[in-house]
């Protein structure tokens, strides 16, 4: 078995950044996270096997990178046992598509060898699932990890993709070639360190969950103009919009322009199933109040039609509290109208 360990001196988020973002998702959390990625000989949990695990954990107040690579199929069980021991002090696993592939695959292999799952009682942060809402906002061509890194301007990958790694590993088993082993380990290293690089993209989610302060507001007669301050620095600037709104983001600031209709704005509501939409009035009414309206004049509201209108008044423009209330759900609805890139 090939075993590697090295400290990570740069290119990985600092502890405070990881604490901040993971703390937004998990309240009971002792900050013993592990970033990890696995390499297998195929997708099937029953007819293929695990041959490599790469992980980043904390040791002596420093991020450290670890790898365990099997030199033959018989070493799979040993790697599984080592990783299980490694995870004993961990309370949060961070991965990319780990909830759908890595963890279920590992649990199946642990079951095969009669080993208790090390994932029991541990929390999981799957960056693929968590960052998926950003696809249209950031104009991402795909949600593959290299595409996320490309958005961030990271273009220094030099090793083969995962599918090529399977071919390389089979070649390694035949030839025992050290150069081939380094290629396989290098790919896994890039994947695991890439988790740290894209981790900062969690900052964009603050736009969705209302974690910002409104610092400026103006009405120019046609548009509501707002500036928002985020609690973190965005890793890459962005811009996007359509005929209804336009927003840009850079560093800790979001600039937002929302088109009004005769000086009025739409206020969206989350619980759309509790409302009727009235097409003739272009507004909604609670079902509890609208049951007496003729069915010809009402429809079940949808996410896109569950809104009322209000005037962009001086009172609204002078109240950051009202502006925040307006944006809390409306902004995510507006972002939801953006089209995914072709």
What are these regions (language model features)?
Residues 1-48, 58-342:
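DEDD superfamily 3′-5′ metal-dependent exonuclease/proofreading module
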